[in-house]
Amino acid sequence: MQNITQSWFVQGMIKATTDAWLKGWDERNGGNLTLRLDDADIAPYHGNFHAQPRYIPLSQPMPLLANTPFIVTGSGKFFRNVQLDPAANLGVVKVDSDGAGYHILWGLTNEAVPTSELPAHFLSHCERIKATNGKDRVIMHCHATNLIALTYVLENDTAVFTRQLWEGSTECLVVFPDGVGILPWMVPGTDEIGQATAQEMQKHSLVLWPFHGVFSSGPTLDETFGLIDTAEKSAQVLVKGYSMGGMKQTISREELIALGQRFGVTPLASALAL
């Protein structure tokens, strides 16, 4: 029998959660991560599944995700501990045939449940499936320090925040030309913040929760992690620049346009217009 802990998706989750903890983005039980799988991914590991999978209803039906398996982080679980005990901190779940709930097929031992942000993740998965024709498979939420810090000092406006991050590091416009969506402060772990995040995910692969953290979407664990890493590096540069008295020069609009043309991307118009 093949051991599911050696599968590419469990090993990938271990690496992503460990890297995020080492970055300082996921203190205590902060942060959550979900990866959409295919039946073929989990088929070799049926022998590892729970004999009687627990069923948990969703707070709202999501028929677009019917019959879809995911690997998810658990509620109250520490990212730093995923590498030590994957089965206790991760779970493979599969949405039922009408999208009304899911079964926990593997992991989440001792009656653990998926992350409390699962509504936000699943709603965002639905929107990214539609926006990318199924290409995006990962949703990641973490507490990236410098991005959070900027939400206290910059106007929490998509165009303003995006333009500042683009100017903070040359690669940013290339990596996220679609800009950064921003919500008002909202109570986490609710359908309301999940719906608001998903609405922004229709247009942006990166969404900020002011004074809290960031949501990211991408086709792979590496791409999704790298998107946050890139934005966070720019935020770090901006924080350092502001602390040294502010910027004396920056990347101009004309240079941003040239950058987009060179790499074949279309920058968010509202941010470019500032």
UniProtKB/Swiss-Prot annotation:
What residues does Zn(2+) bind to? 141, 143, 212
Gene Ontology molecular-function annotations: metal ion binding; rhamnulose-1-phosphate aldolase activity
**Domain of life where this protein originates:** Bacteria
What reactions does this protein catalyze?
L-rhamnulose 1-phosphate = (S)-lactaldehyde + dihydroxyacetone phosphate
E.C. designation(s) = 4.1.2.19
A GO CC term? cytosol
Q: In which pathway does it act?
A: Carbohydrate degradation; L-rhamnose degradation; glycerone phosphate from L-rhamnose: step 3/3
What does the entry comment about cofactor binding? Binds 1 zinc ion per subunit.
Q: Mind listing the GO biological process terms from this record?
A: pentose catabolic process; rhamnose catabolic process
InterPro entries attached here? Aldolase_class_II_sugar_metab, Aldolase_II/adducin_N, Aldolase_II/adducin_N_sf, Rhamnulose-1-P_Aldolase
The catalytic residues are 117
Give the protein's cofactors: Zn(2+)
Q: Where in the cell is it found?
A: Cytoplasm
Write the record's keywords in alphabetical order, separated by commas. Cytoplasm, Lyase, Metal-binding, Rhamnose metabolism, Zinc
Q: Which SUPFAM superfamilies match?
A: AraD/HMP-PK domain-like (SSF53639)
Q: Which family does it belong to?
A: Belongs to the aldolase class II family. RhaD subfamily.
**Assembly information from the UniProt record:** Homotetramer.
According to its UniProt entry, the function of this protein is described as: Catalyzes the reversible cleavage of L-rhamnulose-1-phosphate to dihydroxyacetone phosphate (DHAP) and L-lactaldehyde.
State the protein's name: Rhamnulose-1-phosphate aldolase
Lineage of origin? Bacteria, Pseudomonadati, Pseudomonadota, Gammaproteobacteria, Enterobacterales
